[in-house]
Structure formats: structure tokens, C-alpha cells
Amino acid sequence: MTGLDDVYRARFDERRRRGKMSVWAEIVAYLQRWIDPERPVVDVACDAGYFIRHVRASERWATDIRDVSAELPPDVHFVCTDGLHLRDALRPGYFGTVFMSNYLEHLESSRQVVEQLRIACDLLGPGGRLIVLQPNVRLVGGAYWDFIDHHVALTERSLVEAGELAGLRTVRLVTRFLPYTTKGRLPQGRRLVRLYVRFPPVWWLLGKQTLYVAERPR
């Protein structure tokens, strides 16, 4: 077991992981509007595959620094690698969507954040989209640093700036979207989550994570 395995096992018990599965089914259903189901999708730093198992796509790919292949559906193509080495592991220009959730804050520097977004841009075909769910330090405040493996502080503005430096064009930016963690105030149960994502006014009350959708220019 790696150090990361120890961290995540302590952070998320089995009951909470099962709860996240049902929450993510509705989050992905909402995000699907920006995802072309006729093109391949890759989930970077996929963890237990909360996103990739629910998305509709012509091919489903997932990557993580840990070998989580046993936790993923059998049709998901899994690559065990660091996100900063994806150019060596995946075909450039192949994907219609690259997805990242609660990942960029784990990188070591803002320079690595820009480089990771450049890599995502390279993986996308023309018109392909990057979707990022990102804790926003301006909204979260000091609790952003409650996790020992958080290194980079990002707001909606710095996220957009990093995307522009990486060659991406912003399609949609929702500063307040999801609560900070599933341990917090996000409604539990699929029906409540479905209502939450369909009622933007409540995002302004509970949202601490930013939704960023960007496109590789055609």
C-alpha cells in the first residue's frame, strides 16, 4: 500500500464511498451537456471512477497515479501514470473530453498547473473540451488547507488564466457550483442532488467549488 492509499483510506470510508457513487451519477448527468457521447472521454486522476463510470462516451478512459483498475467498470481503459506524463501514455488529439475533479490543488506549483492544462489541451482534438471541478480557495477559506496533500491555491480567475496560458478558450465558468466536499452540505441521495444541480440559486448559498469548461480551438 502506498502513502496515498493510506491517506485516501483514512479520508473516505466505504459507506462514504458508496454515497459518493450516487451523488456522482447526478453530477455527471448534469455535466453531460458539455460532453460529446460520440467521442472518447478521459478522466484524469480518476480515483474510484466516480465520474467515468457514469459518463456516456464512445470510449471511456481513466488515469491515476495509483492502480485503481480493479475498482473500474470492465470497459474503462485504465492507465496507471502521473498526470504530468500523460503525453507519453495517451494519444494526442484523440479525446473529445478531458475531465479533472479536485486534482489540480494536489500539484506542486502553479507552473505544474499550467503544464497539466497544456497536456490536457494536447490530448483534445479540435473543438474538444476540458471540464474541471475545482475547490475555490477564495470561497473555501482556511478549510482549503485541511487536507495535507493540498499544495496550490486556485480561484476561478487563476483557473481561467491558467487555461488561457495553456491555449484553451473558456466556454463556461460557474464560480459557485458544488459544496467543498461530499462530507459537507451537498444533499445526499440522487433525488436531492438532481434537484440541487437543476436549481442554480442554491449554488450561491452552498457552492464552494468552481466549474470550468474550456475548449481547444478548432
What are these regions (language model features)?
Residues 1-93, 97-101, 114-117, 210:
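Conserved N-terminal segment of class I S-adenosyl-L-methionine
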Residues 14-17, 84, 97, 108-125, ...:
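S-adenosyl-L-methionine-dependent methyltransferase catalytic module, highlighting the catalytic core
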Residues 102-106:
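Short catalytic micro-motifs in class I SAM-dependent methyltransferases
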